[in-house]
Amino acid sequence: MAAGGAEGGPGPSAAMGDCAEIKSQFRTREGFYKLLPGDATRRSGPTSAQTPAPPQPTQPPPGPAAASGPGAAGPASSPPPAGPGPGPALPAVRLSLVRLGDPDGAGEPPSTPSGLGAGGDRVCFNLGRELYFYPGCCRSGSQRSIDLNKPIDKRIYKGTQPTCHDFNQFTAATETISLLVGFSAGQVQYLDLIKKDTSKLFNEERLIDKTKVTYLKWLPESESLFLASHASGHLYLYNVSHPCTSTPPQYSLLKQGEGFAVYAAKSKAPRNPLAKWAVGEGPLNEFAFSPDGRHLACVSQDGCLRVFHFDSMLLRGLMKSYFGGLLCVCWSPDGRYVVTGGEDDLVTVWSFTEGRVVARGHGHKSWVNAVAFDPYTTRAEEAASASADGDPSGEEEEPEVTSSDTGAPVSPLPKAGSITYRFGSAGQDTQFCLWDLTEDVLSPHPSLARTRTLPGTPGATPPASGSSRAGETGAGPLPRSLSRSNSLPHPAGGGKAGGPSASMEPGIPFSIGRFATLTLQERRDRGAEKEHKRYHSLGNISRGGSGGNSSNDKLSGPAPRSRLDPAKVLGTALCPRIHEVPLLEPLVCKKIAQERLTVLLFLEDCIITACQEGLICTWARPGKAFTDEETEAQAGQASWPRSPSKSVVEGISSQPGSSPSGTVV
């Protein structure tokens, strides 16, 4: 079976009625994306995705183990407890990638010393108590996926579990690869994969925050600063060069606003954390920096997307989910749009320049765990330059073709100079979706009828003219055509948006139309009408978390975090109803795994996905997957061995016991 399981036996989802075949390829306008074969069906090791080692979030490791790392070193041969029940939920599988050398280089591997730094890119992902490291993914053609049975390094933690991690791409080089790892008990570990003696632990005594780390990110173009978010809803700024405080930190209020507050740490000497952000209600699930590094988008369990200007700590935008929490967020390559996914089963596209929801996408049957823009098929920059040059697009579109496997029409390639944003989503329903956000959806629409606004709320008033896309599209909007757009019909004007038939508009699925007539509180009360399958709605247990530092989780000073009233927000510019914004249909929607999907990355030559079972899938872009003969013919042009030599693996496996504390290598 290929990595990702194209021919696997029936899993739990099949037993619950989900008998859809797992796909090994899918087709878009540009051609076929194909799943690269792998040498392993799953990673090797005793830990099962269904029987993890129980985490210990409330008991810090005692004695010397507490001082040496986030957990005491556990023997590699000790299996986790097994039982008939599902056991505690594992943290979501996450994948981090660092690129060494020029991704578009001539094909020669970067010169690096032997060991973990040898070769090109590096991939890290967590599964249960373990961290795995592999050689990188395809660059300019590859014939195989990652061999999950041959990690070049592995770390095992006891008493706590890795929940997230991030490489420092800015400083990555042949002599250093910096990695941050967050844990379920709240600690953060700093590692250098080449300098084995370099290791630091932050929040070791859990004095800063006792809840799990939900997300980590290095500040753009920074060698030492990083952000860590926690299930407490707090976001902390750290410097790897500074130690942590030996007592619970004290804070002074710097700034507060709608649903957030920012504090500076009181300390005469440089200490971590440097600052604390209290954002929203409930866990802060994920955050992302804009491409220019100036703005920070945060999504929380309270269902709000908040966009901050990072340096000034000002709230620049606010959006509310249609229902439930938001779990993931991503910026468009040009920084104009933000896409989110969450517990409403929808993907939502929010315009940063206009401060409004421009579209929603309905294709998933359960929560959306990951979203990402594809910068390699997005045409926004080409369209902007063509519009600026005044070059009218007179090319005719290619004739519509039909997919051989489904018989459904495949939309032609968009005209040169047109605006097309491509993004993807991965959900707990094991479905992978691709979406095209086209110019006809992005064109300005009349104001929403009967739309209320909350005075003083960011996002309620669109920015001044000049931020509208009308001036960027050049020769006016394209004719509305469903063959070129993956959006369902929506009202051309706002005059009838609040009419009696608006809630059951033709073309909108029944479930969505029904939700359009309910307030969020009404949906919450109708537990008997839940549409989620039990298996797919295991939920975001690993993302959530309760408890915390009883004295430190309370906001210091008179800065309470306000909560938006869902009943009042629905139908406003912060949260339009379903029929008030375009509803996108997925360009591609395929079942690609047996377990819920948690990872989605777009690279130059491939797409990377991963599921909670610990399987990494590499999907080669059209024309980028070579056969054995083609790979041999192109040797020396654009490819090099993706697996380390035997001596490299042996060198890693025989490292002395002086490796970073809390690990077994």
Swiss-Prot record:
Residues 1-11 have a biased composition (Gly residues). Regulator of the deubiquitinating USP12/DMWD/WDR48 complex. Functions as a cofactor that promotes USP12 enzymatic activity. GO terms for cellular component: cytoplasm; dendrite; nucleus; perikaryon. Widely expressed in brain where it localizes to the olfactory bulb, forebrain, thalamus, hippocampus, cerebellum, cortex and hypothalamus (at protein level). Expression seems to be particularly strong in areas of high synaptic density such as the glomerular layer of the olfactory bulb, and mossy fiber terminal fields of the hippocampus (at protein level). Expressed in retina, with strongest expression in the external and internal plexiform layers (at protein level). Strongly expressed in brain and testis. Residues 52-64, 77-89 have a biased composition (Pro residues). InterPro entries: WD40/YVTN_repeat-like_dom_sf, WD40_repeat_dom_sf, WD40_rpt, WD_repeat_creC_regulators. Its main location: cytoplasm. Coiled coil: none annotated. Gene3D superfamilies: YVTN repeat-like/Quinoprotein amine dehydrogenase. It is found in: Cytoplasm; Nucleus; Perikaryon; Cell projection, Dendrite. Component of the USP12/DMWD/WDR48 deubiquitinating complex. Interacts with USP12; promotes its enzymatic activity. Interacts with USP46. Keywords: Acetylation, Cell projection, Cytoplasm, Methylation, Nucleus, Phosphoprotein, Repeat, WD repeat. Pfam families: WD40. The modification Phosphoserine is found at S487. Residues 65-76, 450-491, 653-665 have a biased composition (Low complexity). The modification Omega-N-methylarginine is found at R543. SMART domains: WD40 (SM00320). WD repeats lie at residues 208-248, 279-318, 321-360, 363-445, 592-629. This is Dystrophia myotonica WD repeat-containing protein. Residues 1-91, 100-119, 380-413, 446-506, 524-564, 628-665 are annotated as: Disordered.
